Amino acid sequence: MGNISSYARTIRGVCLAATLRQGKFGETKISVRAVPGWDAAAVCQRFGGGGHPGAAGATSRLSLEETVKLLEEYILKLYEFCISYPWPEEWLLGCINDYKITDKGELENTPWYKYLVNYIRTMIQECMEKLEFAIRISERPDGPYMYGEMLEREKEMLEDLLKGQTLDFYYQAFEKISFGRLPAKKDDTVNVLCREKVQQLRKEVKKLLEDIRETYLLLSPEQVTERMQTAAPHVETLLKLVISYKEKLDEKKRKENIIDFHDMEHFALNILLKKQEDGSVTASEAAKEYRAYFEEILIDEYQDSNLVQEYILKAVSGEEEEKYNRFMVGDVKQSIYKFRLARPELFLEKYHTYSNEKGDLRRIDLRKNFRSRKEVIDTVNTVFAKIMRKELGGIAYDEAAALYAGAVYPENTGNESELLLFEKPQKEEEQNARQTEALGIAQRIHRLKKEFLVTDKETGNLRPVMYKDIVILLRTNSGWDEEFKEVLAKEGIPAYVAGRTGYFATKEIRDVLQFLRVLDNPLQDIPLFGVMKSVFGQFTDEEVAIIRSSTEDKKKNLYLCVKEFVQEQVLRAKCQAFCEKISGYRACTSYLTILELLQKIFTEYDYPAYVAALPAGEKRLANVEMLLTKAAGFEKNSYYGLFHFVRYMEQLDKYNVDYGEAGTLDESADVVRIMSIHKSKGLEFPVAFVAGLSKKFNMQDTAKALVVDVDMGLGMDYVNPDMRTRSKTLRKNVLATKMKLDNLAEELRVLYVAMTRAKEKLIITGILDNFETKIQQYQKLLEHTEKSIAVTEENMTGAFSRLMDTD
């Protein structure tokens, strides 16, 4: 097996080594690279065009728009989930069987059903805590005592609800829930704020219970079973399409001698483990060889492991032989790769079951933080002690989870953490919210440069802060980083946008790709709007608004509005010229290669000269040249044409197969770094701005027609194509709820990672709309909220997003 040092590598490296060692590829030379779903469009075209029985029926059940792109999206999404499971086909077939339930008894045994019953009980308990808080307020000397009797009766009603164990029980019990009117008795000795707080809490309880009924209890278990049976054949068709797609993709990779990162893991898994007919898993001879060879297995960043990796690690360790030689290191509070289907639950299961006493399965809590000053650590502990709960994220921020200062720093002043809130500009055309926040940060950086000292890494002494000591962390770079960079540049502050995925976000590439999307299909409003505002259209916001408002049909495509615009003569001529350009380029796509099409566009618009004249023009020009290189290389593969190139680039962007911006930055350069929180993981900076906290959480996936969970399968809307109606199903609602809570838990962990990047000073920033009103509301919240109120989905969503109600 070679020297032991050769196994100090990533788990995928170990998987590849194991695969090659077993002669998986013989003498064949293979290429290891990320393979996005770049040929899914062609596969879906064949299926959607009648190549697979029932394909159209599957999409019509899922959505009223029977399009290849929709089918492609579903197949790629389900493929992504299945390959995160140790045996992908087994997962897909399990999802099919999940829908083939025959009665209420089988329904009650499904994972999503059990999750729902537990979730309803948790929400009722939340209502109980709110009512108990209201009762305590009513019992105060200045409290609304006249409400006490009714509140007690309502508390008894909730106690009865907590006895429920089945959906059938709750379906019937919620039909009988009723709230009377609070007594109207007036008493001047009652504190007005106390009265309002009790009324507010009771209103929240009523709304929460009504939401539960509307979301989960409108159909009886029998009706739920019937709808699942109706959907079963369409689910089966869709999932068999995924199996077919996987087979075709695997075949294509074999022909081209390509393996991707998931292949590495699955090849290694199948070498190390054997699945028996009864479903059990046994170690292979190869696994036993590894067990005998490895004395210890040390795993770093264990919180980011997935289920496939867990099986592999377990296979090569000696646990089955009672040889406990796995040492797993990680911090579940920093597990921020759920979108890559990491399983923090693996870490949590061990965290909650292993004892901190000496033994075979022992947990060792590494509490000391050797990065940050006490001021930073105190801020992190204060915030997360209030918002991180076991119910949301699987871990309570208690003494075992809290940070303790271990770093030694020279005495200094001004290290207190700061929360900077900026008022949202009233006139967006003058300055948008992001620019306002960036300007506020720039002004704070100017003051830091004048007065703040940091500890020099080499000497250990204090010195004036430099630009390179400062980082601005963003939840997402897209749409934020370049704007921040431009504002800082105007303020005379050098800045650099760091990030592997900067290529697709750059203006020069984004504008071209939007233009190609429009040439592929002009009836796409969002790309078309971007093109109209770019150098390819040169329309102003006011002109687009005039065109958009020229029709009373609000559902009309923007392209048709442009094409049919007949009002102002000058603008009409501009619209006609724009449409003629698009039509001309669309005609060229039938005989020009992608490279030739791009060269034609760039020549006619003098695009390289335009790009070179922009700030950082040399780098931007290199990005454009890189796009031409990629276009030339694309058509050497199996697929041709604009449609496939657009899909190819979309998949590269979606699956983070990015090239990074052309050019690099010297690490010693004295510039402010702007980067995503994910990019910053593992890094540290003397001064960290955590910016953009007014940005709302992205919950778009929970509202889509198809939602997927690796443990609970898939849920989808119930669509009647004949009646052209759509309604949400119970299963989809449950999966969407779980997804939403998982996303919120992930947002908690992302915030934790961001705040713990700071070594000496932490500054948190955000934008407030209706500044004075929001500040007053926040003060009231602090004055009249008890710590005992649990952090639920609704409360957590409001932590920043509801308070800072901006997009």
What do the PLM-derived regions correspond to, one by one?
Residues 80-114, 118, 142, 214-218, ...:
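Conserved motor-region signature of P-loop NTPase helicases/translocases
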Residues 269-291:
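Conserved helix/coil segment N-terminal to the catalytic DExD/H
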Residues 1-72:
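Gly/His-enriched, cation/cofactor- and phosphate-binding structural elements
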Residues 31-46, 243-248, 667-668, 740:
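Short, hydrophobic/aliphatic alpha-helical segments
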Residues 75-259, 361, 439, 458, ...:
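Conserved ATP-driven helicase/translocase motor core recognized via long
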Residues 536-538, 549-552, 668-671, 723-791:
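C-terminal accessory regions
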Residues 218-229, 245-251, 255, 422-428, ...:
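Short glycine/proline-rich turn/loop motifs
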Residues 694-704:
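Cytochrome P450 core scaffold surrounding the K-helix E-X-X-R motif
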